[in-house]
Amino acid sequence: MKDYYCNQKFYQLKINAEKKVIYSCCRADQEHIDINWLKDNPGELFNTPNLIQERKSMLSNERIPGCENTCWSKEEKGMWSRRLQSENKEKITTLRNKPTQLDITLSSECNLSCSYCCKQYSSTWRKDIEVNGDYKGLSNHNDRYALNNFDRVLKKLSQKKRQQTTIADLVNTEIDMMADGLNSVTMTGGEPLLDHRFSDMIQKFKNTKSVVVHSGLGVSETVLRRGLDAMSDTQHKTTLCISAESIGKNFEFNRQGSNWETFLRYIDIIKEYDVAIQFTSTYSNLNITDYVKFNTMFHEY
């Protein structure tokens, strides 16, 4: 009999502050944050009625619909799933838990329009669609290449106004309440360094053992240094995980909005700070010719 248990639903939380949704595991289906419920249940963002029920179902070895597309259906085809990487890890059976692993997306603010990205992760991609219209023939890609009403609302709100909402305050309070119990934090975007809250957010995780910030370095030198100052002011070394996989003109094509020489200069600037460097690369037919060259150039990381 197949075992449908996965311990990630018991310790991992992903928050998308802009979309007002959470995920119990970064691959699970999203759940919209119920503002009224959270007001009445402070500190319980990781223990919503839905999450409690899903944990009960898992402990009863039931197949959870929220994990269908990313795990169950893939495993049935003999494919790898995220769940399989935690098969031999400790089994957690308590229903109410505090997350020990947090993945937070502050916003989709980003100055780049990378070739394999979309409006969900880049405001520049979204602006391109606003100006030039929806992409044709891509309607089956989960609304990534067409504007919806949520996008139109975002367009009207400045970053400051988005952060002055009830839901933003509630999420901020929840993060404060869970911060001390976190073992690892991952900050993604968009471009996290562009978010006005970045320095304050990093300070919430000052004592967290592992903090990883994902960046495309599509920012000004002033913004970069401000972010590096904040990342250096922590008890444990923060890691800056940089998105790149091409060199020269191909880099500038795939990372539209970037400049190769500026990118190299920024790498040297980062070395001045007490911040670790990693790279995350997307392998595709658009960068295959540079993949080996890039890895050779930055092999030390």
Task: Give the positions of each predicted feature.
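Core AdoMet radical
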Residues: 99-109, 120-167, 179-196, 206-224, ...
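Short functional micro-motifs and their immediate structural scaffolds
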Residues: 76, 115, 122
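Recognition helices and adjacent regulatory flanks at domain boundaries
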Residues: 76-101, 110-112, 133
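A Trp-anchored, charged/polar loop motif used as the substrate-binding/catalytic surface
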Residues: 48, 52, 89-94, 163-176
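Acidic (Asp/Glu)-rich catalytic clusters
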Residues: 227-237, 271, 299
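Accessory C-terminal segments flanking Radical SAM cores
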Residues: 1-89
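Catalytic cores of alpha/beta
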Residues: 285-299
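Short, intrinsically disordered, charge-balanced linker/junction segments flanking boundaries
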Residues: 10, 22, 27-29, 201-204, ...
